[in-house]
Amino acid sequence: MAKYGLYKTFPDLWLQECPAEWEAVKIKYLFSERSEKGYPNEPLLVSSQNIGVVPKEVFGNRTVEASKDLHLLKLVQIGDFVISLRSFQGGLEYAYYRGIISPAYTILVPGEKIDGGYFRYLAKSVRFIELLQMCVTGIREGQNIDYMKLKNHLIPVPSLEEQKKIAQYLDWQVSKINRLIEAKKKEIVRLTELKKTVVNEAVTHGLNPNVPMKFSGVEWLGNIPAHWTTIKLRQILHPFSEKNHPELPLLSVVREQGVIIRNVEDKESNHNFIPDDLSGYKMVKKGQFAMNKMKAWQGSYGISNYTGIVSPAYFIFDVDFENLEYFHYAIRSKVYVNFFAQASDGIRVGQWDLSINKMKEIPFIVPPEDEQNAIVEYIPVAFAKYDEAITTLTEEVDILHELRNKLISDVVTGQIDVRDIEVPDFEYVEETEDESDDDSDEDGVTVDEEV
């Protein structure tokens, strides 16, 4: 693609060079800071690295409950930019809505010399994020961007007309890439659902389609093999609670994977608060069953392959069942997710508190031991073809993300000249936010409920 005719360097600019006709201006001369409070009736906003600053209900249920002191939150207007606690990892966030947000965030209002559309892309470019990382203060969980440092840095500033053209061009090109990404992500979702169907069919009907069937006793479950038995979960799961093991690794219980080791160094996936004192966290031993009781209705539970500690709000059980691998597959199937949903009571959006008494009465279907073993051997083989396709699609999505990021970075830093490119009419396509599969220890749960 075409480059500009002449380039120049600025001594204090973080870019090697930019087009000769562009300016380099300090951020503090392009933006003013908004710090208005006292708007408790405005909608609550959250800052997402993928979809910008949006209402809490748009983002979902992945954030901690807001403070009651809503009058202390900062006002955000449409078109503002927000420096959040994780902006040093993913850039500044553009506000698509008016509302209120954490007072810990810095709100920037674009001035007359900067176009919001242009800066929205510049603020997400790889090179700008590198600049943000130079302005970080604090360590680990306490890291944040020091705006007093950031505002004195230069950024490249084309003419206002050219900024608008760059934003228009990138909207067009990014939409084309996002359309491809969305198609691949949709196929990944379809294949993932097919994998769930494989498990669901195996643990409710077995592998032999010709065996006699009987009514399960549950209307929406239908028939099960006549020679299978049904017991209650209270016969299998026995409550366990042990604390004071802060030296053990921190674990998470997530919907798609069950119990995993939590990466405490990854600030992006650890937006939930991790206390300094972990002595109150519950121990989970390898082979035990751990459950996020607020997210059981989504499937956030499973047999642990690790010994570690989890949120004190979780349920932990010893498991009286010989084939733990079969139990793990079965209990995480769609059938049992539905049972747990029925045994939970909604307390707020996205959070349903599981009743331990109702849970104990959930039926569990038990095939003979040889059939359990056969099902455990069958499922990974059946998964293989889906997993291969999902891996390929995921790699293709990653490549498209890299292509999109490079294009944005090249255009907003003047490595590509788009001034003479005619942009046709197009439909803008945003990449949708992936559903969260994170551990939600802090989703308003502060009571240590023992079972």
Stretch-by-stretch model annotation:
Residues 1-17, 21, 158-211, 366-451:
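Amphipathic alpha-helical coiled-coil/heptad-repeat segments
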Residues 4-39, 160, 164, 215-246, ...:
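Non-catalytic DNA-recognition/assembly elements of restriction-modification systems
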Residues 9-12, 25-78, 234-286, 432, ...:
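Sequence-specific dsDNA recognition surfaces
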Residues 40-62, 81-106, 117-121, 130-135, ...:
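Short, ligand-facing micro-motifs at secondary-structure edges
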Residues 110-115, 319-323:
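Ligand-binding loop in jelly-roll beta-barrel domains
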